[in-house]
Structure formats: C-alpha cells, structure tokens
Amino acid sequence: MIRPQSYLNVADNTGARKVMCIRVLGGIQGQTANIGDVIIAVVKDALPNTGVKKSDIVRAVVVRTRKGIRRENGMFIRFEDNAAVVINKEGNPRGTRIFGPVARELRDRNFTKIVSLAPEVL
C-alpha cells in the first residue's frame, strides 16, 4: 500500500534511484496505490547525467509492494521492497531495462511492455 509521502525504489535504468509518491492516480479511493496503480512522484535521488534529475516530477507504476496482493487462487505474493517503474504519459516505460521481479497483475493492467522487459514475472 503506497500513500502520498511514501518512498519507493526505482526498478529501471532511467537514472532515478528513489522517488516519493505525491499523488495516487486511481487506486483505492484515490488514497492508496497497490501493484499496477499509477502514481505521480518526485525524484529524490538520481544518478548524474541521466534522463531524470533530482526534483523532477514523473509518473510511475507500482511494480512491487511489501504489503503484497492476494490472488484469486488464494496465493499471496509479497516482495522485499516497494518499487516503481517510471513511465511516460502513454504508459510505456522511459527506461530500457527493468530490475528485479514484477507481479503478473501488471499484464492485466495493460503494462505488457514492462512485463516483457522484466527478468522475472511472479
């Protein structure tokens, strides 16, 4: 569950390392985001000479949460960290690589490009 002021790791190679959620687009009553929800975030830590800089405002999709999600078959998926992937307005990732596993629920939310770039889909 990601709320405004929550920090997330960035799971792609855009150059951002940490982002802070400042707005949840959609989600549960517009207050909390789970896996597959789009958020607006501000870059808090970034590598130099890359596509995004510190204090840039970006859109991101949540790909991992410590809270986890329950699937219809009863399985419960939980990750070690909260992570997001920076996207553009069309919903495509701005980076060319995704680091770490992502949840299968992203495919249901039409983020197929992120799922295809991910090294592991759980």
From Swiss-Prot:
UniProt organism field: Stigeoclonium helveticum
One of the GO biological process terms: translation
Chloroplast recorded as keyword: yes
Subcellular location: Plastid, Chloroplast
Family: Belongs to the universal ribosomal protein uL14 family.
Segments forming a coiled coil: none
Protein encoded by which gene: rpl14
Protein name, entry field: Large ribosomal subunit protein uL14c
PROSITE patterns according to UniProt: RIBOSOMAL_L14 (PS00049)
